[in-house]
Amino acid sequence: MPTHLVWFRRDLRLQDNLALAAACRDASARVLALYISTPAQWQAHDMAPRQAAFISAQLNALQAALAEKGIPLLFHEVADFNASIETVKNVCRQHDVSHLFYNYQYEFNERQRDAAVEKTLPSVICEGFDDSVILAPGAVMTGNHEMYKVFTPFKNAWLKRLKEDIPPCVPAPKIRVSGALSTPLTPVSLNYPQQAFDAALFPVEEYAVIAQLRQFCAQGADGYESQRDFPAVEGTSRLSASLATGGLSPRQCLHRLLAEQPQALDGGPGGVWLNELIWREFYRHLMTWYPALCKHQPFIRWTKRVAWQENPHYFQAWQKGETGYPIVDAAMRQLNATGWMHNRLRMITASFLVKDLLIDWRLGERYFMSQLIDGDLAANNGGWQWAASTGTDAAPYFRIFNPTTQGERFDRDGEFIRQWLPALRDIPGKAIHEPWRWAEKAGVVLDYPRPIVEHKQARIATLSAYEAARKGA
């Protein structure tokens, strides 16, 4: 009887799991599951404590769900990816594994690890799957067989390719012949700092995640275009955490969206949310083609020469939400308190750090990863390089958000700001966007800082720094 081992990583679900489905295809095979915790590696990659707590909860739910199918989950903890190579080898030897199944990860360290694992297992058949994307990297290329560097042509080619053959979702495995496991389960515990997360916003059980997806596609996807930019409105899906850890697949998102919004592929209702899924694909494909992105190198080479300011005081003020710009500060306090930030606010806060404070985007990228429950290297790096004008198809370097007008535009009445900045709750109407002006006129002393920089002057300094770097190319 063959023994099939499924190595779980960022794919913590039963439904539409390509590696798990392939491992269970042979009804006569004994199927085992494996998860390896690597705390030192996670620390090096700045994994957020809230994401660790989320993964821990998902693992325990996964363990119970697998047990109902008759599949035991083996849990091991080692320091890092290098140590995990030997662990996989030992598990395969101990359980006489004939086949190893896993879903690809596209980051540089992860790809090196997987290649090393396959090399150490010459007698084991290893099968990998492009599970975390809808279309595999390399499926969408230019006429010169190169990766697209601009999103819109990539999107058009991606849609054309998708319409030719939409990848199906695969069902969860059936109960193995041996039946459900009867032995008591030992709770999985991760040796990594953890912070509590809101399980109502970020559900753990698969059925709850799928219910969240169904509700959004039926009730929210149609209005996503008009509501997605306003942080005081519940206009986004909140599915990013489940996508980041693999509690949900992008194929599940696509199929549910098309079931509810069948015109989405042609730009109809739901099409803007589909765009977000395609952006996710774009950044993953880019990371596979350009591994330097995994090492936090800018895509546009001349931007390496930007003379960043080293100002710990400014950086700390940004981290804590004490910059004196309400929309920036409210956003950062939301991030610090919940592990999540609205996407429009991610753009605003990133732009402020880089183009108002002239601080290296990589410091912001790293801080976001250390806080985000939905931390994902490809998406986070892509977003920061877009905001910093260092990435492919990024905002031009001279596009600099005015944080005050961004607040006035996307939180006009200050509803979101008041939620996160209690010191400003009593400021009337739109005056909340420039509280220092209101305070001066009203003769009130606010428990809130004045702006740490003046935007117009900061903009001039940033343009000068970028132009000097570009001319040195």
Mark where each language-model region is:
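Trp/Phe/Arg-rich N-terminal binding region typifying the photolyase-homology
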Residues: 1-166, 269, 464-469, 473
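Short, contiguous strand/loop micro-motifs
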Residues: 7, 49-50, 104, 225-226, ...
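A broad detector of short, well-ordered amphipathic alpha-helices
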Residues: 21, 90, 329, 347, ...
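Short coil/turn segments at secondary-structure junctions
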Residues: 46, 315, 446-449
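Glycine/tryptophan-enriched, flexible segments
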Residues: 145-300, 410-411, 415-473
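Active-site-proximal binding-pocket segments
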Residues: 234-423
